[in-house]
Amino acid sequence: MPQKPARCYTKRRSKAFSGPPYTRKEYIHGVPPPKIQKFVMGNPHGDYDYIVEVYVTERGQIRHNALEAARVAVHKYLSTTIGDQNYFFRVRVYPHHVLRENKMMAFAGADRLQEGMRQAFGKPVGTAARVYPGQAVLEVRVKKEHLDHAKEALRRGASKLPLPSRIRVIPLKEEAKAAA
């Protein structure tokens, strides 16, 4: 069954979501597991010069399959261009928030079978990560010679995310800070 668009889970007002996140999985039956396979990739023990990260500029929810699509795009580009031992990549958010959907029937005579908005709590259909402005979603650590490849990889990954995002470069060493 196809997924509903993001507008079904967001408000039109300035607030992207209201209320606390719906996360208590011990009380929720049938929550599908997140599609994200790995949160940490590459070489975590390398000596890197820069952190390049994607951060969001608006408040909102990022579904688990959007995070997985961004992860796959970034990891594939980095592993083919600079190799697995030359970067450290991490997904910084976890999809804790459970999304629910009150499924409606869409065929002739459905109005006699379903209850409409009566008891419209909904069944769990997926999970999402709630993010706030300035919060980093994806992070790559690289050496100076691979900085442009990291920016391009994160640009490709950011295009998979449903929120407007930007890329920032943070130098880790003093000589990199002086050059920046």
From Swiss-Prot:
Listed InterPro entries: Ribosomal_uL16, Ribosomal_uL16_arc, Ribosomal_uL16_CS_euk_arc, Ribosomal_uL16_dom, Ribosomal_uL16_euk_arch, Ribosomal_uL16_sf
Keyword Ligase among UniProt keywords: no
GO terms classed as biological process: translation
Pfam families: Ribosomal_L16 (PF00252)
Keywords, sorted A to Z: Ribonucleoprotein, Ribosomal protein
GO molecular function, one term: structural constituent of ribosome
Domain of life: Archaea
Record flagged with keyword Nucleotide-binding: no
NCBIfam families: PRK04199.1-1, PRK04199.1-4
Family: Belongs to the universal ribosomal protein uL16 family.
UniProt protein name: Large ribosomal subunit protein uL16
Species annotation: Hyperthermus butylicus (strain DSM 5456 / JCM 9403 / PLM1-5)
